[in-house]
């Protein structure tokens, strides 16, 4: 009888353990966890399968964040950092074809008219939904000219040396609490490189949407315009109104070489509950 109960007890523990693993994985998948810990930072790096140097950069940024005070410039902010979700996995796979975007996500952007006039007015368009970019596309003519217009995560994987040349060079992670926060949990954003003496006739555009309550969005945008080149980049940001706060803390680094021209336009239409 004791052997039976021992076996039954072990079986129950196994079932409970298996259930907890499923719950844990689903929590990360849905992104419902709140609060920032080193485990959260490392989990983001794991999900993105990043190189070691980026993982260590995130950890340094996290340490600076938890040991620093809010900046002494601007209005006093009453942010509850424990009530923010710092990362949410993509709800639609990254694609360069709008028809392949998840219908739920597509409906949100279609209502805003983000993609409707892409071919008519823009040389390239990107769209980010919460933590991840879900759509990125550029006309083939610019690809032939070696222009790079990618989401930042893809640029890190595809052009690691070019990425490292510009990343964290203008805006250091230890400038203030919010640059450190971005360094720890950055996700998504736009990476643009325009080679020498290349002129883009129409703008590139990216659109950033916070669509979940208590969500933090931390995109990282890098724009490098080489000698004698010209580009106009337009960035749009918005979020619906919820009864709880959200947080947007992005970093933008722009490099403009000799005789180059760069026009950067940002249109931010945040709801009143977004810090």
Segments predicted by a language model, with ranges:
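Polar helix-capping/helix-linker motif
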Residues: 6-7, 159
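Glycine-rich and polybasic anion-binding loops at the starts of cofactor/ligand-binding domains
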Residues: 22-275
